[in-house]
Structure formats: C-alpha cells, structure tokens
C-alpha cells in the first residue's frame, strides 16, 4: 500500500524496535512511578463545555508531511504559555520525528511551561509507547483506529487508562467509529483529514456526529481555519476542537486562538 498512513506506520514499527533496544520496557515500567501527576485531559475539556465555552486542544506542531515546515521559529515552551493565556483547555504536542519533525523533549518543554493537560500526538502502535508517553508526562494519548486492529485498540486503551491517562480515539469514517465505540474511552475524535490521502473536509464531522453517543465527548480535528468553521461546528452542537496549523502560522499562537474562538 502506498498511502501516507501505511508509510508512517511501517517507519513507526522500526522506530519502536530501536527505542526498545535502547531502553528496555522494564525500565519504563519502573520509571512510570516517578512520572509527574496526571492532569485531567477530558475533565478540562468538559469543564470548558459546561461553562458554555469552546473547548480547544491547541496543537504544538512544527511541520507536517503535507505542508512541510509550518513554523520555522519553533519554541514549544513559549507556544504553550501563549496558548494557555489565549484560552486553550489542553495541548497536543507532536512527538513523531520522521514525518512531523517532533520530539519527546517538545512535549516535556511545553508541559513544564504551563498548567494545561497534554496529549502526546503520535502514531501509537505498541504498549511500549504508552508507557513512554506517561514517563514523558503525557496526560492523554492518541489511538488512531485506522492504524490498529480491534485487539490493539482494546489493549492499548486499557493500558493507558490503567496508567491514569485519557485516550483520544480517532476515527475518519462510520466503520472506524463503530470499532471505536467498542472501547470504553470517553472521548472520540473525528478527523476531517483522511490520513491515507491527507485531504480535508469538515463535512466528515457533520456527517458522523449523530452516530456518536451523547456520553462520549466529541472532538472535531483538522481543517478549522476560520470563524465560519467554528460557527459551523458550534451551530451543529460540537464544542470541542483540536486545532494546530491555523495557530502555528501566526506570530502569537495564543492570540490566534483567542481571535478564532473567543473574539466576540
């Protein structure tokens, strides 16, 4: 298969094997005990929504496979502070090295600079990465349904929750949503970007939202670029957003966030 997701996953399997060779799983399992206390990720989003506000997961992202380098002047700690000041509920930090120019250190720098819960945004395919995320200080991990079989999805989500983390289970179509709902994670992300082609359509969320049970927190991801996009979602009853690129392209990301979501 030549699609982008398969290319990323093949490389990720190699990366996990290399990391495991450098630092055994047993070391990580011991290190979890001294990881920083978990900050409630879902709780922070729910609090914003309950207050009538948009719940924004603001992304700390230097580059992407489709756009190349998005933010050349990339300082994760400064970005995190700016986001918190701008009204973000949570952060999402890219740690994938090969395709997004991310780094584990970026997550630590961002989290240390603010009080917000942080999602480790990566392609999780192995229990090793779940322990790794918690050791780094992550409060939530991403599980992409298109990247996992049902057994992996169940096992990895259960492990993450047993370590105190929240899980954002990401889907792109109805078949993936049906699989995601077999997992008791309280949060479903609908990615408007097709990870096989990287094409974006906000209609993806609008078409699928009614199939998401009310007891799951629905997050719309990708393609939220202007106030009209926010209004479209909020009018449809969707109040949680994951946004990155729109903020990374402005000098003060937090001000970009405030303008997009909170400027009356």
UniProtKB/Swiss-Prot annotation:
The lineage of its organism: Bacteria, Pseudomonadati, Pseudomonadota, Gammaproteobacteria, Lysobacterales. Pfam families: IGPS (PF00218). Belongs to the TrpC family. GO terms for molecular function: indole-3-glycerol-phosphate synthase activity; phosphoribosylanthranilate isomerase activity. Keywords: Amino-acid biosynthesis, Aromatic amino acid biosynthesis, Decarboxylase, Lyase, Tryptophan biosynthesis. One of its GO terms (biological process) is L-tryptophan biosynthetic process. It catalyses: 1-(2-carboxyphenylamino)-1-deoxy-D-ribulose 5-phosphate + H(+) = (1S,2R)-1-C-(indol-3-yl)glycerol 3-phosphate + CO2 + H2O. InterPro entries: Aldolase_TIM (IPR013785), Indole-3-glycerol_P_synth (IPR045186), Indole-3-glycerol_P_synth_dom (IPR013798), Indole-3-GlycerolPSynthase_CS (IPR001468), RibuloseP-bd_barrel (IPR011060). This is Indole-3-glycerol phosphate synthase. The keyword Cell inner membrane does not apply. Pathway: Amino-acid biosynthesis; L-tryptophan biosynthesis; L-tryptophan from chorismate: step 4/5. Its EC number is 4.1.1.48.
């Amino acid at each position: 298969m030549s699609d982008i997701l398969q290319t990323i996953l093949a490389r990720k399997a190699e990366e996990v094997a290399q990391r495991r060779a450098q630092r055994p799983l047993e070391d990580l399992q011991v290190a979890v005990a001294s990881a920083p206390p978990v900050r409630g990720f879902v709780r922070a989003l729910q609090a914003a929504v309950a207050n009538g506000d948009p719940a924004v997961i603001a992304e700390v992202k230097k580059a992407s496979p489709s756009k190349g380098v998005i933010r050349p002047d990339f300082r994760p700690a400064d970005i995190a502070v700016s986001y918190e000041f701008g009204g973000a509920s949570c952060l999402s930090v890219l740690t994938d090295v090969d395709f997004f120019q991310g780094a584990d250190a970026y997550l630590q720098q961002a989290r240390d600079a603010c009080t917000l819960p942080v999602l480790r945004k990566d392609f999780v395919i192995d229990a090793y990465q779940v322990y790794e995320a918690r050791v780094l200080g992550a409060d939530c991990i991403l599980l992409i349904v298109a990247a996992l079989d049902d057994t992996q999805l169940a096992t990895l989500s259960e492990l993450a929750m047993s370590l105190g983390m929240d899980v954002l289970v990401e889907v792109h179509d109805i078949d993936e949503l049906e699989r995601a709902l077999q997992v008791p994670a309280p949060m479903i992300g609908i990615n408007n970007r097709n990870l096989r082609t990287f094409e974006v359509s906000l209609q993806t969320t609008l078409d699928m939202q009614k199939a998401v049970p009310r007891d799951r927190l629905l997050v719309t991801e990708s393609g939220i670029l202007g106030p009209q996009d926010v209004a479209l979602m909020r009018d449809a009853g969707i109040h949680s957003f994951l946004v990155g690129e729109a903020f990374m392209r402005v000098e003060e990301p937090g001000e970009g966030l405030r303008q997009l979501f909170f400027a009356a």
